[in-house]
């Protein structure tokens, strides 16, 4: 399962990334594209991939964690919350800096700590995602870095410290 996240408002080049995955990967697989609340993007992608058994378009959902837990790899912009959620879910992550310079520190941190791979464009993102799906050791090394770097219960620890102090 490939998961392409375009954010809550549905930005980025999800279609180009999907095209590259379809070109590079074969066999039994599904690409889920989460388009958020962007109805224009949803319509465009549904028309483009009508009849394609490998592609599913998903609008805004509160069940992102379910998609993350099912994914073999996720491609997303480097938003802080989404990136951290991916690391907590231990899903191999490819980050593509789409449009905001404020997310540049996120991609620098995640990629330098082995929590993600940085992609320069749609083709690069697809290439890295397919490589992570095919190379189980590479994907597991990223999961291990995620386990060792991101504390999934950090909020509980902070609350406990506040209550006990």
Label each residue range with its predicted role.
Residues 65, 83-89, 108:
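Short alpha-helical segment that forms part of, or immediately flanks, the ligand-binding pocket
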Residues 1-70, 104:
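Donor-nucleotide binding loops and adjacent catalytic segments primarily
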Residues 111-137:
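C-terminal "capping" alpha-helix adjacent to the active site of nucleotide-linked donor transferases
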Residues 138-152:
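A short, well-ordered alpha-helix in the C-terminal region of glycosyltransferases
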Residues 69-79:
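Acidic donor-binding loop of glycosyltransferase active sites
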Residues 90, 105-115:
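Acidic, glycine-centered active-site loop in nucleotide-sugar glycosyltransferases
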Residues 151-165:
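C-terminal alpha-helical cap of glycosyltransferases
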Residues 71-72, 90-92:
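A short alpha->beta transition loop at the rim of the catalytic pocket in nucleotide-sugar-dependent
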């Amino acid at each position: 399962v490939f998961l392409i996240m375009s954010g809550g408002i549905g930005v980025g080049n999800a279609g180009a990334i999907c095209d590259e995955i379809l070109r590079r990967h074969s066999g039994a697989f599904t690409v889920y594209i989460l388009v958020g609340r962007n109805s224009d993007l949803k319509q465009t992608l549904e028309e483009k991939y009508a009849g394609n058994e490998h592609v599913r378009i998903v609008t805004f959902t509160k069940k992102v964690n379910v998609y993350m837990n099912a994914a073999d790899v996720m491609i997303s912009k480097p938003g802080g919350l989404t990136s951290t959620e991916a690391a907590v879910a231990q899903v191999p992550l490819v980050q593509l800096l789409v449009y905001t310079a404020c997310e540049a520190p996120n991609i620098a941190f995640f990629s330098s700590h082995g929590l993600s791979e940085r992609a320069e464009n749609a083709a690069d993102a697809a290439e890295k995602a397919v490589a992570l799906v095919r190379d189980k050791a590479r994907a597991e090394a990223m999961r291990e870095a995620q386990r060792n770097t991101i504390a999934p219960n950090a909020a509980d620890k902070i609350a406990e410290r506040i209550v006990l102090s």
